[in-house]
Protein backbone atom coordinates (compact mmCIF):
# COMPACT_ATOMS: atom_id res chain seq x y z
CA UNK A 1 0.00 0.00 0.00
CA UNK A 2 1.59 3.28 -1.06
CA UNK A 3 1.81 6.38 1.14
CA UNK A 4 0.16 8.33 -1.67
CA UNK A 5 -2.92 6.08 -1.58
CA UNK A 6 -3.31 6.64 2.16
CA UNK A 7 -3.04 10.41 1.72
CA UNK A 8 -5.65 10.70 -1.02
CA UNK A 9 -8.23 8.35 0.51
CA UNK A 10 -9.68 9.86 3.71
CA UNK A 11 -10.28 7.66 6.71
CA UNK A 12 -13.95 6.88 7.34
CA UNK A 13 -15.66 5.53 10.43
CA UNK A 14 -16.19 1.94 11.47
CA UNK A 15 -19.55 0.48 12.53
CA UNK A 16 -21.21 1.00 15.89
CA UNK A 17 -20.38 -1.84 18.25
CA UNK A 18 -23.47 -1.42 20.42
CA UNK A 19 -26.56 -2.89 18.77
CA UNK A 20 -29.90 -1.45 19.82
CA UNK A 21 -32.40 -4.16 20.88
CA UNK A 22 -34.52 -5.83 18.22
CA UNK A 23 -38.29 -5.46 18.51
CA UNK A 24 -38.96 -8.78 16.79
CA UNK A 25 -37.37 -12.20 16.49
CA UNK A 26 -35.70 -13.17 13.25
CA UNK A 27 -37.37 -16.28 11.79
CA UNK A 28 -35.24 -19.45 11.67
CA UNK A 29 -33.08 -19.60 8.56
CA UNK A 30 -32.83 -15.81 8.10
CA UNK A 31 -30.38 -14.50 5.53
CA UNK A 32 -28.30 -11.32 5.41
CA UNK A 33 -27.88 -10.98 1.65
CA UNK A 34 -25.59 -7.94 1.67
CA UNK A 35 -22.60 -7.46 3.95
CA UNK A 36 -18.89 -6.89 3.48
CA UNK A 37 -15.70 -7.97 5.23
CA UNK A 38 -12.76 -5.53 5.38
CA UNK A 39 -9.26 -6.75 6.17
CA UNK A 40 -7.38 -7.24 8.31
CA UNK A 41 -5.25 -5.12 6.02
CA UNK A 42 -2.09 -6.77 7.28
CA UNK A 43 -3.28 -9.82 5.34
CA UNK A 44 -5.69 -8.33 2.79
CA UNK A 45 -4.47 -4.86 1.73
CA UNK A 46 -6.87 -2.29 0.35
CA UNK A 47 -6.80 -1.21 -3.27
CA UNK A 48 -4.66 1.84 -3.92
CA UNK A 49 -7.43 3.31 -6.07
CA UNK A 50 -10.02 3.30 -3.25
CA UNK A 51 -11.95 6.49 -2.49
CA UNK A 52 -11.82 6.15 1.31
CA UNK A 53 -10.05 4.09 3.97
CA UNK A 54 -12.19 2.28 6.54
CA UNK A 55 -10.88 0.54 9.64
CA UNK A 56 -10.66 -3.23 9.63
CA UNK A 57 -14.04 -4.98 9.94
CA UNK A 58 -12.97 -8.61 9.71
CA UNK A 59 -14.83 -11.90 9.58
CA UNK A 60 -14.86 -12.33 13.36
CA UNK A 61 -16.65 -9.02 13.90
CA UNK A 62 -19.34 -9.85 11.37
CA UNK A 63 -19.99 -13.22 13.02
CA UNK A 64 -20.67 -11.35 16.29
CA UNK A 65 -23.30 -9.28 14.47
CA UNK A 66 -24.87 -12.41 12.97
CA UNK A 67 -25.27 -13.97 16.37
CA UNK A 68 -26.64 -10.77 17.91
CA UNK A 69 -29.29 -10.33 15.21
CA UNK A 70 -30.21 -13.99 14.80
CA UNK A 71 -28.94 -14.34 11.23
CA UNK A 72 -28.04 -17.86 10.08
CA UNK A 73 -26.92 -17.45 6.47
CA UNK A 74 -25.25 -14.73 4.47
CA UNK A 75 -24.01 -13.41 1.16
CA UNK A 76 -20.68 -11.62 1.46
CA UNK A 77 -20.49 -8.94 -1.23
CA UNK A 78 -16.95 -8.09 -2.26
CA UNK A 79 -16.21 -4.41 -1.49
CA UNK A 80 -14.69 -1.96 -3.94
CA UNK A 81 -12.02 -0.95 -1.43
CA UNK A 82 -10.36 -4.35 -1.88
CA UNK A 83 -10.33 -4.04 -5.68
CA UNK A 84 -10.76 -7.11 -7.91
CA UNK A 85 -8.75 -9.36 -5.58
CA UNK A 86 -11.56 -11.37 -3.99
CA UNK A 87 -9.36 -13.19 -1.47
CA UNK A 88 -10.81 -11.51 1.63
CA UNK A 89 -14.37 -12.35 0.59
CA UNK A 90 -13.74 -15.91 -0.56
CA UNK A 91 -11.71 -16.63 2.57
CA UNK A 92 -14.66 -15.45 4.68
CA UNK A 93 -16.87 -17.90 2.79
CA UNK A 94 -14.40 -20.71 3.43
CA UNK A 95 -14.27 -19.89 7.14
CA UNK A 96 -18.06 -19.74 7.43
CA UNK A 97 -18.44 -23.53 7.37
CA UNK A 98 -21.03 -23.41 4.63
CA UNK A 99 -23.09 -20.50 5.94
CA UNK A 100 -21.90 -17.87 3.44
CA UNK A 101 -21.87 -17.40 -0.31
CA UNK A 102 -20.02 -14.66 -2.18
CA UNK A 103 -20.77 -12.08 -4.83
CA UNK A 104 -17.47 -11.10 -6.42
CA UNK A 105 -15.93 -8.09 -8.12
CA UNK A 106 -14.11 -8.68 -11.39
CA UNK A 107 -11.27 -7.16 -13.37
CA UNK A 108 -11.89 -6.10 -16.99
CA UNK A 109 -9.74 -8.97 -18.25
CA UNK A 110 -11.55 -11.66 -16.24
CA UNK A 111 -11.91 -15.06 -17.89
CA UNK A 112 -14.52 -17.78 -17.63
CA UNK A 113 -12.03 -20.25 -16.09
CA UNK A 114 -11.32 -17.70 -13.34
CA UNK A 115 -15.03 -17.41 -12.58
CA UNK A 116 -15.33 -21.19 -12.50
CA UNK A 117 -12.55 -21.34 -9.91
CA UNK A 118 -14.36 -18.73 -7.80
CA UNK A 119 -17.56 -20.76 -8.04
CA UNK A 120 -15.73 -23.70 -6.49
CA UNK A 121 -14.92 -21.40 -3.56
CA UNK A 122 -18.51 -20.31 -3.00
CA UNK A 123 -19.09 -17.45 -5.44
CA UNK A 124 -22.63 -17.21 -6.78
CA UNK A 125 -22.65 -13.93 -8.70
CA UNK A 126 -20.82 -10.84 -9.98
CA UNK A 127 -21.35 -7.28 -8.81
CA UNK A 128 -21.05 -4.20 -10.99
CA UNK A 129 -20.77 -1.16 -8.68
CA UNK A 130 -20.50 1.98 -10.75
CA UNK A 131 -22.31 4.60 -8.69
CA UNK A 132 -20.21 7.80 -8.44
CA UNK A 133 -19.35 7.04 -4.80
CA UNK A 134 -17.40 3.96 -5.90
CA UNK A 135 -16.74 4.15 -9.61
CA UNK A 136 -17.00 6.06 -12.84
CA UNK A 137 -20.77 6.39 -12.82
CA UNK A 138 -21.09 4.41 -16.04
CA UNK A 139 -21.51 0.72 -16.76
CA UNK A 140 -18.90 -0.97 -18.94
CA UNK A 141 -21.53 -2.48 -21.22
CA UNK A 142 -19.14 -4.65 -23.24
CA UNK A 143 -17.75 -6.26 -20.08
CA UNK A 144 -21.23 -6.52 -18.59
CA UNK A 145 -22.69 -8.29 -21.61
CA UNK A 146 -19.80 -10.76 -21.75
CA UNK A 147 -19.92 -11.55 -18.05
CA UNK A 148 -23.71 -11.86 -17.97
CA UNK A 149 -23.45 -14.60 -20.59
CA UNK A 150 -20.93 -16.43 -18.40
CA UNK A 151 -23.15 -15.94 -15.35
CA UNK A 152 -25.88 -17.75 -17.24
CA UNK A 153 -23.55 -20.69 -17.87
CA UNK A 154 -22.60 -20.78 -14.18
CA UNK A 155 -26.16 -20.40 -12.83
CA UNK A 156 -25.10 -17.15 -11.18
CA UNK A 157 -26.85 -13.85 -10.55
CA UNK A 158 -25.68 -10.38 -11.52
CA UNK A 159 -25.75 -7.57 -8.97
CA UNK A 160 -25.79 -3.83 -9.75
CA UNK A 161 -25.17 -0.71 -7.66
CA UNK A 162 -25.76 2.60 -9.43
CA UNK A 163 -27.01 6.14 -8.94
CA UNK A 164 -30.79 6.46 -9.13
CA UNK A 165 -30.92 8.40 -12.39
CA UNK A 166 -28.85 5.73 -14.17
CA UNK A 167 -31.80 3.36 -14.12
CA UNK A 168 -33.35 4.95 -17.21
CA UNK A 169 -30.39 4.20 -19.46
CA UNK A 170 -30.07 0.71 -17.95
CA UNK A 171 -33.72 -0.31 -18.05
CA UNK A 172 -33.85 -1.73 -21.56
CA UNK A 173 -30.66 -3.77 -21.12
CA UNK A 174 -31.77 -5.10 -17.73
CA UNK A 175 -35.26 -5.95 -18.96
CA UNK A 176 -33.80 -8.25 -21.62
CA UNK A 177 -31.69 -10.35 -19.24
CA UNK A 178 -32.64 -13.92 -18.41
CA UNK A 179 -30.59 -14.46 -15.25
CA UNK A 180 -31.47 -13.26 -11.73
CA UNK A 181 -30.64 -9.55 -11.61
CA UNK A 182 -30.21 -7.85 -8.23
CA UNK A 183 -30.42 -4.10 -7.62
CA UNK A 184 -28.75 -2.77 -4.48
CA UNK A 185 -30.06 -0.25 -1.97
CA UNK A 186 -33.53 0.50 -3.40
CA UNK A 187 -31.84 1.58 -6.64
CA UNK A 188 -30.47 4.57 -4.64
CA UNK A 189 -33.70 6.49 -5.30
CA UNK A 190 -34.35 9.67 -3.29
CA UNK A 191 -37.22 8.93 -0.88
CA UNK A 192 -38.15 12.58 -0.45
CA UNK A 193 -39.27 12.62 -4.09
CA UNK A 194 -41.93 10.01 -3.32
CA UNK A 195 -43.15 6.88 -5.06
CA UNK A 196 -44.25 8.74 -8.20
CA UNK A 197 -40.79 10.02 -9.14
CA UNK A 198 -39.52 8.78 -12.53
CA UNK A 199 -36.53 6.93 -11.05
CA UNK A 200 -38.68 4.88 -8.71
CA UNK A 201 -41.43 4.27 -11.25
CA UNK A 202 -38.83 2.83 -13.62
CA UNK A 203 -37.54 0.60 -10.82
CA UNK A 204 -41.08 -0.59 -10.09
CA UNK A 205 -41.66 -1.34 -13.78
CA UNK A 206 -38.50 -3.45 -13.83
CA UNK A 207 -39.56 -5.25 -10.68
CA UNK A 208 -42.63 -6.56 -12.46
CA UNK A 209 -40.30 -8.76 -14.54
CA UNK A 210 -39.74 -12.27 -13.16
CA UNK A 211 -35.92 -12.14 -13.21
CA UNK A 212 -35.57 -8.84 -11.33
CA UNK A 213 -34.77 -8.64 -7.62
CA UNK A 214 -34.19 -5.71 -5.26
CA UNK A 215 -32.41 -5.47 -1.93
CA UNK A 216 -34.06 -3.60 0.93
CA UNK A 217 -30.62 -2.46 2.05
CA UNK A 218 -28.91 0.83 2.71
CA UNK A 219 -31.98 2.75 3.91
CA UNK A 220 -29.53 4.97 5.79
CA UNK A 221 -27.74 5.80 2.54
CA UNK A 222 -30.81 7.23 0.83
CA UNK A 223 -32.86 8.55 3.77
CA UNK A 224 -33.12 12.19 4.78
CA UNK A 225 -34.75 11.22 8.10
CA UNK A 226 -31.87 9.74 10.08
CA UNK A 227 -32.10 7.88 12.41
CA UNK A 228 -35.76 6.89 11.93
CA UNK A 229 -35.49 6.44 8.14
CA UNK A 230 -39.27 6.64 7.87
CA UNK A 231 -39.12 8.38 4.50
CA UNK A 232 -37.91 5.07 3.02
CA UNK A 233 -40.94 3.10 4.24
CA UNK A 234 -43.28 3.99 1.32
CA UNK A 235 -40.62 2.84 -1.15
CA UNK A 236 -40.13 -0.45 0.67
CA UNK A 237 -43.83 -1.18 0.99
CA UNK A 238 -44.38 -0.49 -2.69
CA UNK A 239 -41.62 -2.91 -3.66
CA UNK A 240 -42.92 -5.56 -1.27
CA UNK A 241 -46.40 -5.18 -2.78
CA UNK A 242 -45.18 -5.30 -6.39
CA UNK A 243 -42.72 -8.20 -6.03
CA UNK A 244 -43.32 -9.96 -2.70
CA UNK A 245 -41.32 -13.01 -3.83
CA UNK A 246 -38.32 -11.05 -5.19
CA UNK A 247 -37.34 -8.66 -2.43
CA UNK A 248 -34.52 -9.57 -0.05
CA UNK A 249 -32.81 -7.87 2.88
CA UNK A 250 -29.31 -7.21 4.15
CA UNK A 251 -27.45 -5.26 6.80
CA UNK A 252 -24.91 -3.52 4.53
CA UNK A 253 -22.50 -3.94 7.46
CA UNK A 254 -20.00 -2.36 8.18
CA UNK A 255 -21.58 0.77 6.65
CA UNK A 256 -18.48 2.17 4.97
CA UNK A 257 -18.05 5.69 3.70
CA UNK A 258 -19.37 7.61 6.71
CA UNK A 259 -17.35 10.45 8.21
CA UNK A 260 -19.97 11.95 10.56
CA UNK A 261 -20.60 9.85 13.67
CA UNK A 262 -24.16 11.22 13.86
CA UNK A 263 -24.98 9.60 10.52
CA UNK A 264 -23.47 6.19 11.25
CA UNK A 265 -26.47 3.82 11.47
CA UNK A 266 -27.12 1.35 14.25
CA UNK A 267 -27.66 -2.20 13.07
CA UNK A 268 -30.49 -2.74 15.52
CA UNK A 269 -32.35 0.31 14.20
CA UNK A 270 -31.85 -0.75 10.58
CA UNK A 271 -33.06 -4.27 11.30
CA UNK A 272 -36.12 -2.99 13.16
CA UNK A 273 -37.13 -1.15 9.99
CA UNK A 274 -38.33 -4.51 8.71
CA UNK A 275 -41.36 -4.07 10.98
CA UNK A 276 -42.26 -1.00 8.93
CA UNK A 277 -41.21 -2.39 5.55
CA UNK A 278 -43.08 -5.67 6.03
CA UNK A 279 -45.62 -5.47 8.89
CA UNK A 280 -46.72 -9.11 8.80
CA UNK A 281 -44.68 -12.10 9.94
CA UNK A 282 -45.45 -13.83 6.65
CA UNK A 283 -43.99 -10.93 4.66
CA UNK A 284 -40.85 -10.89 6.78
CA UNK A 285 -40.44 -14.65 6.48
CA UNK A 286 -40.51 -14.32 2.70
CA UNK A 287 -37.98 -11.50 2.68
CA UNK A 288 -35.61 -13.06 5.22
CA UNK A 289 -35.94 -16.78 4.52
CA UNK A 290 -38.01 -17.94 1.56
CA UNK A 291 -36.87 -15.48 -1.10
CA UNK A 292 -33.12 -15.65 -0.48
CA UNK A 293 -33.25 -19.42 -0.05
CA UNK A 294 -34.91 -19.74 -3.44
CA UNK A 295 -32.57 -17.25 -5.10
CA UNK A 296 -29.30 -18.55 -3.75
CA UNK A 297 -30.31 -22.20 -3.46
CA UNK A 298 -29.90 -24.56 -0.58
CA UNK A 299 -26.12 -24.16 -0.60
CA UNK A 300 -25.44 -22.61 2.79
CA UNK A 301 -25.90 -24.77 5.84
CA UNK A 302 -27.65 -23.56 8.96
CA UNK A 303 -25.57 -21.95 11.66
UniProtKB/Swiss-Prot annotation:
Task: Provide this UniProt record's keywords sorted from A to Z.
Answer: Hydrolase
Q: Give the activity regulation note.
A: Completely inhibited by ZnCl(2) and CuCl(2).
Q: Which InterPro entries match?
A: Amidohydro-rel, Aro_Compnd_Degr_Hydrolases, Metal_Hydrolase, SML-Hydrolase
Entry EC number(s): 3.1.1.92
Q: Which cofactor does it need?
A: Zn(2+)
Activity profile over pH? Optimum pH is between 7 and 7.5. Approximately 30% of the maximal activities are still detected at pH 5 and pH 9.
Q: Name one Pfam family in it.
A: Amidohydro_2
Hydrolase is among the record's keywords: yes
Catalysed reactions, as listed in the record: 4-sulfomuconolactone + H2O = maleylacetate + sulfite + 2 H(+)
Known partners and oligomeric status: Monomer.
- Protein's UniProt name: 4-sulfomuconolactone hydrolase
Per the UniProt entry, what species is this protein from, by scientific name?
Answer: Hydrogenophaga intermedia
